[in-house]
């Protein structure tokens, strides 16, 4: 074909003889190319109808005569003939080779750019439009987006009916009629006008008829164009009134006897379309094209209310399930907290037992020795630290236990005899010792006037003393007051203890301590201690001892010095 570059798919190339050239050879006539099947302005259609155009199209291009031996049906089968579309993307220009443009086309090397065969995606990247997600919108054919050209049916993938990836559905509902099959050359073509839309656009379809003897028509998927929308957005059924043109259109189809076949074809196309959507949902994520198709179908057939009802029912079910889920979750959390508490109790018990077992046993501290407290009015004579003092008890004094045992173990006892009165010397070890004695008063009227008996009942603190000189027997002992305190004296001194019960009205007891020995005392007699008593022989305790502090009250201690 000389200078013949067809810029449309082969299936849309039609050779149509005009009425004025019926007697001539059809091959000598000019041909017209159908680029698209979409609404056209009514003025254009009227001009075309006045010229008795056999084929209605938006654009018609006159091409040179087809060379002898080559007809329209042989163009697709001829491998030597290449069909190309000039495309642009931004400032870049390239050529789309249609026979290499197969579904899905995005990564197929079908674009010739700078003598290189690249894919449309690569071409968009080289043109600097890679930020656009849709490559069909980035590529333009004659100033029109490639997606819009494919949605309107002006161009399609090569042999799309045989090779399809199921990911190439258009976003327009009128894609159902985009793959119209061209009429066979030599057939007469009649024009059927669809209803006029509100903006003045009309939709037209071409119906090829055979000879008058044959009443049948060859229908294919392109005949579903009778149900296309007047505009790209479609006409809502509930908002439009049925016009007279619409009524005449469908009445004409019914009069011809094609209503049943049209309905069957529409049903098949709808089933295939919806089945394809379901299959793509299984194979790949939901796509924008599927959403557009479903939206157009729902709006066309008034199914949006039904879809909303389904959504409401599902939302109620989800809310009920969510409430049940939250209740179950709260119950599980409560059970988990209880189990945690139960698990922590044995741990605490075991930890307590372990702490008790591992706790070091602390031995109780030995009790402190009671501190000896002396009256503040007394003069304390500290003993010599070199010589250990000893306690000497001079008999005749017998200690008889009353009420409790009294132990004098490990105490050296020396018995001395002088004259008729035995003297027993008890030597006590150094250090403070605590003895409890009872207050017992023995008068001169007793059987043994030289003996005083002391019973353990009260507190008597023996501090210190020195060794006593041997003395004679004690005479005229009448009274001895207890409790009494023996005060420590320095070593080498002869102590004279006199217990005298005063006959005065205040009844004080005076204990006189003479640190110096009696110079007039006879060495042979060895008088060391003189106990003088008054005239009164009745028992009178003036000194009081506190239980815990062991202090002597109301006792006056007088130290006599030379």
From Swiss-Prot:
Domain SAND: from-to ranges? 72-156
Location in the cell: Nucleus; Cytoplasm
Q: Which residues form a coiled coil?
A: 311-355
MF GO annotations:
DNA-binding transcription activator activity, RNA polymerase II-specific; DNA-binding transcription factor activity; Hsp27 protein binding; identical protein binding; metal ion binding; RNA polymerase II cis-regulatory region sequence-specific DNA binding
Q: Which residues bind Zn(2+)?
A: 103, 160, 164, 168
Spans annotated as Disordered: 360-384
Work out whether the entry's keyword set contains Kinase.
no
InterPro entries per UniProt: SAND-like_dom_sf, SAND_dom
Keyword list, A-Z: Acetylation, Coiled coil, Cytoplasm, DNA-binding, Metal-binding, Nucleus, Transcription, Transcription regulation, Zinc
Fill in the subunit field for this protein: Homodimer, and heterodimer of GMEB1 and GMEB2. Interacts with TRIM63. Interacts with the glucocorticoid receptor (NR3C1) and NCOA2/TIF2. May interact with HSP27 and CREB-binding protein (CBP).
State what this protein does. Answer: Trans-acting factor that binds to glucocorticoid modulatory elements (GME) present in the TAT (tyrosine aminotransferase) promoter and increases sensitivity to low concentrations of glucocorticoids. Also binds to the transferrin receptor promoter.
Cited PANTHER family: GLUCOCORTICOID MODULATORY ELEMENT-BINDING PROTEIN, GLUCOCORTICOID MODULATORY ELEMENT-BINDING PROTEIN 1
Q: What is this protein called?
A: Glucocorticoid modulatory element-binding protein 1
Write down the species. Mus musculus
Gene name as annotated: Gmeb1
């Amino acid at each position: 074909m000389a200078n013949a570059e067809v810029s449309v798919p082969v299936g849309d190339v039609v050779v149509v003889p005009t009425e004025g050239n019926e007697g001539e050879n059809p091959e000598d006539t000019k041909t017209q190319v159908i680029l698209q099947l979409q609404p056209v302005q009514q003025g254009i259609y009227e001009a075309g109808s006045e010229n008795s155009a056999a084929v209605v199209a938006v654009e018609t291009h006159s091409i040179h005569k087809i060379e002898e031996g080559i007809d329209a049906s042989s163009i697709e089968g001829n491998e030597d003939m290449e069909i190309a579309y000039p495309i642009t993307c931004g400032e870049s220009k390239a050529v789309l080779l249609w026979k290499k443009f197969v579904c899905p086309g995005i990564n197929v090397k079908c674009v010739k750019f700078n003598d290189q065969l690249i894919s449309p995606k690569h071409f968009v990247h080289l043109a600097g439009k890679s930020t656009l997600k849709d490559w069909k919108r980035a590529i333009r054919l004659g100033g029109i987006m490639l997606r819009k050209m494919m949605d309107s049916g002006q161009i399609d993938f090569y042999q799309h009916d045989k090779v399809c990836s199921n990911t190439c559905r258009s976003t327009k509902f009128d894609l159902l009629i985009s793959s119209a099959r061209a009429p066979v050359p030599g057939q007469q073509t009649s024009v059927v006008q669809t209803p006029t839309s509100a903006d003045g656009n009309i939709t037209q379809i071409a119906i090829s008829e055979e000879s008058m003897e044959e009443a049948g028509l060859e229908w294919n998927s392109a005949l579903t164009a009778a149900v296309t929308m007047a505009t790209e957005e479609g006409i809502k059924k509930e908002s439009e009134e049925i016009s007279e043109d619409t009524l005449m259109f469908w009445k004409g189809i019914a009069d011809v006897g094609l209503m049943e076949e049209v309905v069957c074809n529409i049903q098949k196309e709808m089933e295939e379309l919806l089945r394809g959507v379901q299959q793509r949902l299984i194979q790949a994520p939901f796509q924008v094209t599927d959403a557009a198709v479903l939206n157009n179908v729902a709006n066309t057939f008034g199914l949006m209310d039904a879809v909303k009802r389904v959504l409401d029912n599902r939302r109620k079910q989800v809310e009920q399930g969510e409430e049940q889920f939250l209740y179950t979750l709260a119950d599980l959390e409560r059970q988990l907290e209880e189990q945690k508490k139960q698990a922590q109790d044995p741990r605490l018990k075991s930890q307590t037992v372990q702490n008790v077992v591992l706790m070091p046993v602390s031995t109780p501290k030995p009790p402190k020795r009671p501190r000896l407290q002396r009256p503040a009015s007394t003069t304390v004579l500290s003993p010599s630290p070199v010589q250990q003092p000893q306690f000497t008890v001079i008999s005749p004094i017998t200690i008889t236990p009353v009420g409790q045992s009294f132990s004098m173990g490990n105490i050296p006892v020396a018995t001395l005899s002088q004259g008729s009165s035995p003297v027993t010397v008890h030597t006590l070890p150094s250090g403070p010792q605590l003895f409890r004695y009872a207050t017992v008063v023995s008068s001169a009227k007793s059987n043994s006037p030289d003996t005083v008996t002391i019973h353990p009942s009260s507190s008597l603190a023996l501090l210190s003393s020195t060794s006593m000189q041997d003395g004679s027997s004690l005479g005229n002992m009448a009274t001895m007051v207890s409790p009494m305190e023996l005060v420590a004296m320095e070593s080498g001194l002869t102590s004279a203890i006199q217990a005298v019960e005063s006959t005065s009205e205040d009844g004080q007891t005076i204990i006189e301590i003479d640190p110096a020995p009696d110079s007039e005392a006879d060495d042979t007699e060895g008088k060391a201690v003189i106990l003088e008593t008054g005239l009164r022989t009745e028992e009178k305790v003036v000194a009081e001892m506190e239980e815990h502090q062991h202090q002597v009250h109301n006792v006056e201690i007088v130290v006599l010095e030379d």
